[in-house]
Regions:
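Amphipathic alpha-helical packing segments from all-alpha helical-bundle domains
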Residues: 76-79, 109, 126-151, 160-164, ...
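Amphipathic alpha-helical segments used for helix-helix packing
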Residues: 107-128, 175-179
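Helix-turn-helix
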Residues: 2, 23, 31-65, 69
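N-terminal intrinsically disordered/low-complexity leader segments
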Residues: 1-19, 204-205
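Generic hydrophobic, amphipathic alpha-helix propensity
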Residues: 20-28, 45, 70-74, 78, ...
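Hydrophobic alpha-helical connector segments
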Residues: 69, 83-109, 162-166, 189, ...
Length: 205
């Protein structure tokens, strides 16, 4: 009796280009966050991504090109994430608290990205992207305080400097977050919130 023919095993489909690039960016982000740009070698990045050297070079011909792509990956959609987090906050609470809660939520959800962003950037182009990122965040904050100025609940001078003040405080929180200093982070968040809400006396919309 003839044995039934075995069905050929289905080959696992190769990841599509978009999926492969996202995978490389995600793994390279972790590598840059852990080692920094200078210490991370091209071999480290290839090994971490587990793709062939040829494929890796095809997508990213240099470490600099890869870093720029990872940096874009980190900051693209950042303000949109803040807007989404802000929309989930209680509209009846202080505007400063709402802004802080949105930023803290993003810090907590994307610590690896912040670890990389705190590393020294390798060139002027990267510095320019980080500068633009900071300006976008300041613009987001200013937009949340503008209605308070219009309603006479916040003077325009305070509203103008408040985004920079909040950003400076957030930088301190960010540093402690990437160090996983949870107790210190919790205390710092509460103290920042209490201090700024006291300065901006009536920050409810």
């Amino acid at each position: 009796m003839a044995k039934p023919k075995r069905k050929p095993a289905r080959e696992k489909p190769a990841p599509r280009r978009g999926e492969r690039v996202r995978h490389i960016l995600g793994e390279s982000l972790k590598c840059f966050a852990e080692q920094g740009f200078e210490r991370a070698t091209y071999d480290d990045l290839i090994a971490r991504s587990r793709v062939s050297r040829g494929s890796f070079y095809w997508y990213f011909p240099s470490k600099e090109a890869l870093y720029e792509a990872v940096l874009d990956y980190c900051v693209s959609g950042y303000v949109a994430r803040l807007e989404a987090a802000y929309a989930k906050t209680d509209r009846k609470t202080h505007a400063v608290k709402r802004v802080l809660d949105a930023c803290f939520a993003d810090f907590d959800a994307n610590r690896t990205q912040y670890r990389m962003l705190l590393r020294p950037p390798p060139n002027a182009k990267a510095i320019g992207k980080l500068r633009q990122w900071n300006e976008d965040v300041a613009e987001f904050m200013a937009g949340k305080f503008a209605p308070l100025v219009a309603a006479g609940k916040l003077d325009s001078g305070t509203a103008k400097i408040l985004p920079d003040v909040i950003s400076a405080f957030l930088d301190g929180v960010c540093v402690r977050l990437v160090l996983d200093d949870e107790r210190s982070v919790s205390r710092l968040e509460k103290n920042i919130e209490a201090f700024l809400c006291k300065i901006v006396e009536d920050g409810r919309a």
